[in-house]
Amino acid sequence: MAALLLLSSAARVGVAAPLALRQQRPVVLPGGQLRTGSGAGAASAWAARPLRPELAAVSRPAVPARGRAPLFRPRAWMASSQIASSAFTWGTIAVLPFYTLMVVAPNADVTKRAVDSSAPYVALGILYAYLLYLSWTPDTLRAMFASKYWLPELTGIVRMFASEMTVASAWIHLLAVDLFAARQVYHDGIKNNIETRHSVSLCLLFCPIGIATHVLTKVLAGSIGRSH
């Protein structure tokens, strides 16, 4: 009888052992972690344990962004500060030959042809539009017209000019307007035989003063001519 009991208990142990081993078979998790255990309790306990950050980052596949990348990405070529600095420098250099011709040789044919050309204004206009595109933000109009009457306010303009790109675009705007004003002064001087060298020079950096100087010069020249 005792022998039969021993055999039956051994048979139960022999059957239970493979079952336990099958239930405790390790499972490979994403990221290389192993999970062992048996039953629902072990599965829930392991499910509650998060993966280590470095393994979780490896196990998650990257999701590609939808849509195509833009073909024209100027910011990838140069930094914003480099673009603003280059535009500021080259824009200034581009207008200097026209001022030099109007001051050094106002009556030369090459000066008249150069001043009559529209090329510098087209080039400055394209450069200005490019810088304006780079500096534009959703808050640009709100900063410009911060008043409830939709009028510009000084505080909003000051905030706008905190950006180098905005300053560069404003400088190109001034260069184009100043050169156009200097051309008008030059043409008026040629037409009325009035000296314009000093007025054209002032138009480069102090355009309103240059225009006022030309008007004053024209008045003085007219009064002197009438006296003679």
Curated annotation (Swiss-Prot):
It is a multi-pass membrane protein. Residues 1-41 form a transit peptide. InterPro entries: ABA4-like. Pfam families: ABA4-like. The chain crosses the membrane at residues 77-97, 112-132, 154-174, 195-215. It is found in: Plastid, Chloroplast envelope; Plastid, Chloroplast membrane. In etiolated seedlings, expressed in roots, coleoptiles and vascular tissues of roots. In root apexes, expressed in quiescent center (QC) and root caps. In field-grown plants, expressed in leaf blades, young stem nodes and the base of axillary buds and adventitious roots derived from the nodes. In reproductive organs, expressed in anthers and pistil of young flowers, lemma of mature flowers and parts of developing grains. GO terms for cellular component: chloroplast envelope; chloroplast membrane. Keywords: Chloroplast, Membrane, Plastid, Transit peptide, Transmembrane, Transmembrane helix. Coiled coil: none annotated. Disruption phenotype: Mutant etiolated seedlings display reduced ethylene-response in roots and enhanced ethylene-response in coleoptiles. Mature mutant plants have increased shoot length, branches and adventitious roots at high node position on the shoot and impaired grain filling. Induction: Induced by ethylene in roots. GO terms for biological process: abscisic acid biosynthetic process; xanthophyll biosynthetic process. Required for neoxanthin biosynthesis, an intermediary step in abscisic acid (ABA) biosynthesis. Involved in an ABA pathway that acts at or downstream of ethylene receptors and positively regulates root ethylene response. In coleoptiles the MHZ4-dependent ABA pathway acts at or upstream of EIN2 to negatively regulate coleoptile ethylene response. PANTHER family: PROTEIN ABA DEFICIENT 4, CHLOROPLASTIC (PTHR34543:SF1). 'Mao huzi' means cat whiskers in Chinese. This is Protein MAO HUZI 4, chloroplastic. The gene is MHZ4.
